[in-house]
Amino acid sequence: MKASTLVVIFIVIFITISSFSIHDVQASGVEKREQKDCLKKLKLCKENKDCCSKSCKRRGTNIEKRCR
């Protein structure tokens, strides 16, 4: 009985660690997307610090704002 409990604990720990590593990979993908989107003419507009020029307007149906 003790051996099966240890195996179950090991499996739960393994699944937890693997889910954290998958989450980190997805987060790095989001960071890469943000870097790609921040091109010279299509920089994302920040509310506090506008990375664009003063003409920051909505583009498309997305909530995020981009420069023209």
UniProtKB/Swiss-Prot annotation:
Entry function: This toxin only weakly stabilizes ryanodine receptor 1 (RyR1) opening in a long-lasting subconductance state (55% of the full conductance state obtained only at high concentrations (1 uM)). In addition, it has been shown to dose-dependently stimulate ryanodine binding to RyR1 with the lowest activity of all calcins (EC(50)=376 nM). It also augments the bell-shaped calcium-[3H]ryanodine binding curve that is maximal at about 10 uM calcium concentration. It binds a different site as ryanodine. It acts synergistically with caffeine.
Main location: secreted
Gene Ontology molecular function terms on file: calcium channel inhibitor activity; toxin activity
Site (described: Essential for stimulation of [3H]ryanodine binding to RYR1): 66, 68
Subcellular location: Secreted
Cystine connections: 38-52, 45-56, 51-67
Free-text tissue specificity from the UniProt record: Expressed by the venom gland.
Originating organism: Urodacus yaschenkoi (Inland robust scorpion)
Propeptide: 28-35
Keyword Secreted belongs to the record: yes
Stated name of the protein: Urocalcin
One Pfam family here: Toxin_27
Domain notes: The presence of a 'disulfide through disulfide knot' structurally defines this protein as a knottin.
Recorded family membership: Belongs to the scorpion calcin family.
Signal peptide residues on this chain, from the entry's feature table: 1-27
Highest taxon in the source lineage: Eukaryota
Keywords: Calcium channel impairing toxin, Disulfide bond, Ion channel impairing toxin, Knottin, Neurotoxin, Ryanodine-sensitive calcium-release channel impairing toxin, Secreted, Signal, Toxin
GO CC terms in record: extracellular region
Annotated region (Essential for stimulation of [3H]ryanodine binding to RYR1), positions in chain: 57-59
InterPro entries found in the cross-reference section: Scorpion_calcine
Record-linked SUPFAM superfamilies: omega toxin-like
